[in-house]
């Protein structure tokens, strides 16, 4: 069973690790068999599985259902599950919803936001619910950002993101996802935090990498983000593509410069 202790050890050893989104038992089993030890049941399922144009319509019930499916397929992986949009607006709501995801099989819940979430993170941790933070491009805030844009490019934004990351760690977060930020900022955050940092569109400097499974397998086609790579394009079956993904992350080949933001 992969645990957060393994990820901490890998960070200390500077050993890169690979993660991916998963939404059903069949793909979760295949991913686990190819060596992926960390999976995320992301609210990205609203776009990849349900056909919405954002993650906002996803419900807690959706997340619970897919978390159960993935856990059945990959019983030994470290499994993260997103708390969906507006499911952590109050302390009571947050604790109840996080408990539902944990009962469904999650090892950790992920929520989007900065320092304003400190009390929430602290409260969850005190109640034995491990927390993964998510900074940078946070898709639930798409209407605030005015679209899916790179974050932290100016000095003010970069300093704020770093401060948010420190605050989340101090509040008890055990893991952090960093999305769509410049490589230099990702390097600062990864170096300054003692907790593992997983990047997506954040360069090869983070402790681990994650991709949406449809992007990694070329299913999204022309709509795939620039930081993604189609690992199925080189030929072979899905299992071979996943093995390439794992191998390229662990050897530092992915993400390359063309998959990163300067």
Curated annotation (Swiss-Prot):
Keyword annotations from UniProtKB, A to Z: Cytoplasm, Magnesium, Metal-binding, Pantothenate biosynthesis, Transferase
EC number: 2.1.2.11
Pathway: Cofactor biosynthesis; (R)-pantothenate biosynthesis; (R)-pantoate from 3-methyl-2-oxobutanoate: step 1/2
Entry-linked Gene3D superfamilies: Phosphoenolpyruvate-binding domains
Cofactor details (free text): Binds 1 Mg(2+) ion per subunit.
InterPro entries in the record: Pantoate_hydroxy_MeTrfase, Pyrv/PenolPyrv_kinase-like_dom, Pyrv_kinase-like_dom_sf
Residues noted as binding 3-methyl-2-oxobutanoate in the record, renumbered to the chain: 43-44, 82, 110
GO cellular component, one term: cytoplasm
Active site: 179 (proton acceptor)
Cofactor(s), names only, from the UniProt record: Mg(2+)
One GO-annotated biological process of the protein: pantothenate biosynthetic process
Localization (cell): Cytoplasm
Single GO molecular function: 3-methyl-2-oxobutanoate hydroxymethyltransferase activity
Superkingdom assignment: Bacteria
Residues engaged in binding Mg(2+): 43, 82, 112
Oligomer and partners: Homodecamer; pentamer of dimers.
Annotated family: Belongs to the PanB family.
Name the UniProt record assigns to this protein: 3-methyl-2-oxobutanoate hydroxymethyltransferase
Organism per entry: Sodalis glossinidius (strain morsitans)
Taxonomic path: Bacteria, Pseudomonadati, Pseudomonadota, Gammaproteobacteria, Enterobacterales
């Amino acid at each position: 069973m992969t645990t957060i202790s393994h990820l901490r050890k890998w960070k200390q050893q500077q050993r890169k690790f690979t993660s991916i989104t998963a939404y059903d038992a069949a793909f979760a089993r295949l991913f686990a068999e190819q060596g992926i030890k960390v999976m995320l049941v992301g609210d990205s399922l609203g776009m990849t599985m349900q056909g919405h144009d954002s993650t906002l319509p996803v419900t807690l019930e959706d997340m619970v259902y897919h978390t159960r499916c993935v856990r059945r397929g990959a019983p030994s992986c470290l499994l993260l599950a997103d708390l969906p949009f507006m499911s952590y607006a109050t302390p009571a709501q947050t604790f109840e919803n996080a408990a539902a995801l944990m009962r469904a099989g999650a090892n950790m819940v992920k929520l989007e936001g900065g320092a304003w979430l400190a009390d929430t993170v602290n409260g969850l941790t005190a109640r034995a619910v491990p927390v993964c933070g998510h900074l940078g491009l946070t898709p639930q805030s798409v209407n605030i950002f005015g679209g899916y844009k790179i974050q932290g490019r100016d000095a003010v934004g970069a300093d704020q993101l770093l401060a948010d990351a420190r605050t989340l760690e101090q509040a008890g977060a055990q893991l952090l996802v960093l999305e769509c930020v410049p490589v230099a900022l990702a390097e600062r955050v990864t170096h300054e935090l003692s907790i593992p940092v997983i990047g997506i569109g954040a360069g090869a400097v983070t402790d681990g990498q994650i991709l949406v499974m449809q992007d990694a397998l070329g299913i999204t086609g022309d709509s795939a983000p620039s930081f993604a790579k189609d690992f199925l394009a080189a030929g072979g079956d899905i299992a071979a593509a996943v093995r390439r993904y794992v191998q390229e992350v662990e050897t530092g080949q992915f993400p390359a410069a063309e998959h990163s933001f300067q």
